[in-house]
Amino acid sequence: MLATLKSEESSGQLQLVEREDIDDDEDLFEAIDKLIAQGINAGDVKKLQDAGIYTCNGLMMHTKKNLTGIKGLSEAKVDKICEAAEKLVNFGYITGSDALLKRKSVIRITTGSQALDELLGGGVETSAITEAFGEFRSGKTQLAHTLCVSTQLPTNMRGGNGKVAYIDTEGTFRPDRIVPIAERFGMDPGAVLDNIIYARAYTYEHQYNLLLGLAAKMSEEPFRLLIVDSVIALFRVDFSGRGELADRQQKLAQMLSRLIKIAEEFNVAVYMTNQVISDPGGGVFVTDPKKPAGGHVLAHAATVRLMFRKGKGEQRICKVFDAPNLPEAEAVFQITAGGIADAKD
């Protein structure tokens, strides 16, 4: 059961603007068991589910090499399964008009700050990866906690009307932090916490396996947000030195590919935080230049890249570093007891 708004008026500063509601009942994916009606053996469908494939959309995102690696699925069976899936989902060409129509299923989740929402074109977008990088205490994790709550708001209040999955690689998730944020939005804290599933990852392999296990949950329940805080930390620990850099980047690319597929398969917003490293080529006019960790592999995976930095007091500054549909601009926001909010003069 999703969290409900309290009857009393919210004490938050956010101006909630109503918008045309989205049909939450509309199927955004085809369940894998629909293959049975297409003549696929129920036992083979079960093998796909055991391998973490729960939708026909997700099936078509796997290579035949990966599928034939599933125990009990021969090349002939895989060909038949893929042929059946192609009848249920269209992974071919569509017109630009159809692509525009498909974009209408995208939800933009409020950050809690009107200025930050406007910078992002309405909020954090589903079916996309939003990366926030910056130094410690720049507001990345605070935004993650605020999104845990705002995602559960109704869509006509700029929420996602869905649940949240949180993968924590640095031990920074604080459930007690959720309570005042939920109260600020006029929501029941207990219900909000019940709609967040949380896992602490300790190795990069553990982090990847946690992602694999999400498909089963997301195919059954309405999730709208996946948080990975932070995406790079365990890779920097588990791989050391230039000798392991190529292997690290390959494993990182595999994990990022999985994040992209989750975002598009289930129409969820993926919000991941990233660390920064020194940039020797940053220029002589910049004091202590920094750049996001992860290299080109991470840069190409993120749909929207945001650079966070500290302002005066509790104020923080967010800059659009890279995005396909947003201009390079900045917004000032503030960290409050109730989460991310507009900055006070």
Curated annotation (Swiss-Prot):
Primary location class: nucleus
GO biological process annotation, one example: chromosome organization involved in meiotic cell cycle
GO MF, any single term: ATP-dependent activity, acting on DNA
Domain of life: Eukaryota
Single GO cellular component term: condensed nuclear chromosome
Cysteine pairings via disulfide bonds: none
Pfam families registered for this protein in UniProt: Rad51
InterPro entries, per database record: AAA+_ATPase, Dmc1, DNA_recomb/repair_Rad51_C, DNA_recomb/repair_RecA-like, DNA_repair_Rad51/TF_NusA_a-hlx, P-loop_NTPase, RecA_ATP-bd, RecA_monomer-monomer_interface
Entry similarity comment: Belongs to the RecA family. DMC1 subfamily.
Role noted for this protein: May participate in meiotic recombination.
Subunit structure: Double stacked ring-shaped homooctamer.
The protein's name in its UniProt record: Meiotic recombination protein DMC1 homolog
Organism placement in taxonomy: Eukaryota, Viridiplantae, Streptophyta, Embryophyta, Tracheophyta
